[in-house]
């Protein structure tokens, strides 16, 4: 027997028992007559000690290094009262070593567990980094989340059904990872960006409640919360309304937070996309932050200040203000930094006004734009924003998208900088009623979610007549500013699906080539269906309290989509490429 107990499970009830432990040497203290070691496994740490009276054991112990892998056999004894360590779960006991087996000693480590290592070092030696307590706890939490989800789904009648990994490239918003076919030379499979079409086909097959915890792949630029391969909790249902799907999934997340964090998230508020963008400048608003954007175009549309009046009177313009309580203490340097920050989002400047004394009229206002705005305008601004003495107002005026993005980002930054965002709170919500389409950089229409999302209360002819005004029957779950899940009611009418493809500029030939199987399937008694997908990585990131998604994935990629440990991606063997009928235009190094 290699192990009788996990290290972290030993306690006073085991005193007097003989135990066999297997794990790693965490720390070593040589006190001359005794050598004390902390032995670690996935469940925790326990202290063991060697007595010099046993020369053989003592000699072995003196040659061990940190992170050596060992087996310890010994007797559990109670610590003296003065030696109890309340900071250790096993701090009331220790193990007198009676035998030791060294599975493998360790060389000098390339990581220092007692200090912060660079992320590059951590990813290169990931197998060592995962031995750290925090990382081990993150992965254990992830495993418990997936176990919880499987139990919940099983209890609610869902079937876990696998869908293909090698599939057909379809336009879903990001670039595909392609896999060449050896048998069908010149042809490629695509790794799925999501199981979207397959889960809809399962609904057409009669499996009315499907779920899968599944790997997905997107070849896109990475961020702190994005990876080229990620894991979804994928869900699809038939004969349920959007409201019923949301209720079912809200209950799952509510129950998960209770299970993992003992936190009651309460009832999730529902907010329209328009409301979220208007008040928070984001379709995933962080409601822990009390700051809100206030539109003032009607107040400033007639002022003799082109920076304000032009966007205030433009169809695609927006003028808004962000009130920051007690913000008048901000220095000019800080304000300049915020001006540079909004420029990242295309803003040409950042007007501001400090409210020093409301009762003093214009003399109580400090602002570089005060000369363009009279007392009547400022009084209207103060009334609408409920500004108080000591506040500062930041103004955004430009095209709607620029102002919304810039002021939304500024809201978040100021919330963090001035500690206005409650880091201890949990603020979930649903965002609904998204636009069905948006315009890309060239003015063409694209699907805001994906082209299989149904519109709200429109016939195909009505949708075709004015697509830009169409509202999608879509919904996103947002927690603390992160989109943790998103879904929609799907199109189940072949005419509606063809109408959407036409609006997106997909001609009939491409429709048949890329989606012919779907259009055919829609003709044979397709049920109404709706679904949702959660990002497992992002959920785990929130529950564990980390801000880096790589901390909740065992072997993640860098922001350059590379694995530093295995050195993937790598060049392929020329002979293999020849078998695949592939020729590269890049010379191998």
UniProtKB/Swiss-Prot annotation:
CDD domains: AspRS_core, EcAspRS_like_N. The keyword Nucleus does not apply. InterPro entries: Aa-tRNA-synt_II, aa-tRNA-synth_II, aa-tRNA-synth_II/BPL/LPL, Asp-tRNA-ligase_1, Asp-tRNA-ligase_1_N, Asp/Asn-tRNA-synth_IIb, AspRS_core, GAD-like_sf. Pfam families: GAD (PF02938), tRNA-synt_2 (PF00152), tRNA_anti-codon (PF01336). ATP binds at residues 218-220, 227, 483, 535-538. L-aspartate binds at residues 172, 218, 449, 490. It is an enzyme of class 6 (ligase). GO terms for biological process: aspartyl-tRNA aminoacylation. The keyword Protein biosynthesis applies. It is found in: Cytoplasm. GO terms for molecular function: aspartate-tRNA ligase activity; ATP binding; nucleic acid binding. Its EC number is 6.1.1.12. It comes from the Bacteria. Keywords: Aminoacyl-tRNA synthetase, ATP-binding, Cytoplasm, Ligase, Nucleotide-binding, Protein biosynthesis. One of its GO terms (cellular component) is cytoplasm. PROSITE patterns: AA_TRNA_LIGASE_II (PS50862). Belongs to the class-II aminoacyl-tRNA synthetase family. Type 1 subfamily. Catalyzes the attachment of L-aspartate to tRNA(Asp) in a two-step reaction: L-aspartate is first activated by ATP to form Asp-AMP and then transferred to the acceptor end of tRNA(Asp). PANTHER family: ASPARTATE--TRNA LIGASE, MITOCHONDRIAL, ASPARTYL/LYSYL-TRNA SYNTHETASE. Homodimer. NCBIfam families: aspS_bact (TIGR00459), PRK00476.1 (NF001750). This is Aspartate--tRNA ligase. It comes from Haemophilus ducreyi (strain 35000HP / ATCC 700724). The gene is aspS.
């Amino acid at each position: 027997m290699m192990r009788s107990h996990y290290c972290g499970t030993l306690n006073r009830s085991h005193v007097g028992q003989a135990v066999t432990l297997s794990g790693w040497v965490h720390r070593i203290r040589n006190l001359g007559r005794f050598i004390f070691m902390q032995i670690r496994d996935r469940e925790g740490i326990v202290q063991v000690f060697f007595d010099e009276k046993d020369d053989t054991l003592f000699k072995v112990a003196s040659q061990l290094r940190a992170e050596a892998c060992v087996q310890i056999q010994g007797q559990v004894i109670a610590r003296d009262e003065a030696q109890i360590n309340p900071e250790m779960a096993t701090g009331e006991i220790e193990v007198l070593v009676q035998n030791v087996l060294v599975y493998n000693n360790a060389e000098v480590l390339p990581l220092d567990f007692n200090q912060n290592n660079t992320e590059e070092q951590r990813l290169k030696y990931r197998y060592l980094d995962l031995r750290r307590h925090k990382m081990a706890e993150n992965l254990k939490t992830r495993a418990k989340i997936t176990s919880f989800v499987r139990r919940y789904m099983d209890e609610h009648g869902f079937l876990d059904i696998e869908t293909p990994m090698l599939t057909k490239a379809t336009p879903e918003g990001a670039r595909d990872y392609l896999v060449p076919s050896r048998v069908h030379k010149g042809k490629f499979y695509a790794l799925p960006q999501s199981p979207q079409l397959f889960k809809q086909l399962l609904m057409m097959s009669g499996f009315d409640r499907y779920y899968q915890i599944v790997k997905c792949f997107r070849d896109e630029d990475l961020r702190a919360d994005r990876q080229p391969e990620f894991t979804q909790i994928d869900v699809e249902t038939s004969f349920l309304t959007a409201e019923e799907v949301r209720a079912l999934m809200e209950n799952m997340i509510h129950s998960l937070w209770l299970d993992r964090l003992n936190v009651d998230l309460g009832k999730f508020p529902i907010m329209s996309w328009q409301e979220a963008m208007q008040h928070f400048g984001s379709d995933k608003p962080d409601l822990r932050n009390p700051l809100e954007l206030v539109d003032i175009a009607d107040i400033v549309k007639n002022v003799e200040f082109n920076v304000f009046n032009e966007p205030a009177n433009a169809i695609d313009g927006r003028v808004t203000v962000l009130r920051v309580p007690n913000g008048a203490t901000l220095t000019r340097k800080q304000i300049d930094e915020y001006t540079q920050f909004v420029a990242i989002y295309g803003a040409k400047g950042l007007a501001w006004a400090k409210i020093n004394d409301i009762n003093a009229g214009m003399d109580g206002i400090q602002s570089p734009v005060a000369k363009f705005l009279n007392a009547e305008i400022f009084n209207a601004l103060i009334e609408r924003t409920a500004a108080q003495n000591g506040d500062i107002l930041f103004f955004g005026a430009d095209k709607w998208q620029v102002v919304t993005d810039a002021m939304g980002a500024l809201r978040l930054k100021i919330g963090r900088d001035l500690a206005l965002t409650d880091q201890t709170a949990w603020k979930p919500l649903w965002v609904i009623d998204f636009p069905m389409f948006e315009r890309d950089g060239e003015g063409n229409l694209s699907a805001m979610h994906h082209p299989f999302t149904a519109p709200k209360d429109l016939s195909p002819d009505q949708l075709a007549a004015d697509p830009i005004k169409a509202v999608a029957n879509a919904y996103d779950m947002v927690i603390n500013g992160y989109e943790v899940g998103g879904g929609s009611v799907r199109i189940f009418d072949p005419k509606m699906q063809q109408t959407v493809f036409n609006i997106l500029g997909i001609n009939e030939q491409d429709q048949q080539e890329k989606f012919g199987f779907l259009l055919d399937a829609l003709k044979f008694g397709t049920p109404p269906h709706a679904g949702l997908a959660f990002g497992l990585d992002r959920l785990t990131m929130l529950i564990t309290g980390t801000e880096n998604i790589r901390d909740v994935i065992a072997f993640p990629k860098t922001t350059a989509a590379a694995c530093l440990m295995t050195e993937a991606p790598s060049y392929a063997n020329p002979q293999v490429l020849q078998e695949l009928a592939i020729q590269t235009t890049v010379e191998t190094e």
